[in-house]
């Protein structure tokens, strides 16, 4: 399973690249989507590689992401009780394992918002106009996407930047 994060905005972007980002549901900076890895997805990612970063997400990071940032439609938090009713999985960990193993697609879960909003990363991005291979942030980063996601999930802070009680 791939985690894809948009790191650059819309200014000066070609229309076909913007359309591809829209098809990937990456309309704003710091939005994340979870995608299955296939030839079509790889082609789309190659087209928008200068505006997004992506890599393979692991079970631990996905569990933390589901627990802290995943929302139902209506912007309600995903709780353990509702998780069991909607997905049939008893815990976040079981759902994360099933998603990573490809047993279920994230888009198949009913009433879950397909785009996950994240905070800007702690200590910022590297150079957003430079590829990850050259010391920047854009493009494929493999397993290192997990470090970036963990820097973007700040426990105890809600989506509006307010401290949760």
UniProtKB/Swiss-Prot annotation:
GO terms for molecular function: RNA binding; structural constituent of ribosome. One of its GO terms (biological process) is maturation of LSU-rRNA from tricistronic rRNA transcript (SSU-rRNA, 5.8S rRNA, LSU-rRNA). InterPro entries: Ribo_uL30_ferredoxin-like_sf, Ribosomal_uL30, Ribosomal_uL30_arc, Ribosomal_uL30_euk_arc, Ribosomal_uL30_ferredoxin-like. Gene3D superfamilies: 1.10.15.30, Ribosomal protein L30, ferredoxin-like fold domain. SUPFAM superfamilies: Ribosomal protein L30p/L7e (SSF55129). The keyword Cell membrane does not apply. Pfam families: Ribosomal_L30. GO terms for cellular component: cytosolic large ribosomal subunit. PANTHER family: 60S RIBOSOMAL PROTEIN L7, LARGE RIBOSOMAL SUBUNIT PROTEIN UL30. Part of the 50S ribosomal subunit. NCBIfam families: PRK06049.1 (NF004711), uL30_arch (TIGR01309). Belongs to the universal ribosomal protein uL30 family. This is Large ribosomal subunit protein uL30. The lineage of its organism: Archaea, Methanobacteriati, Thermoplasmatota, Thermoplasmata, Thermoplasmatales.
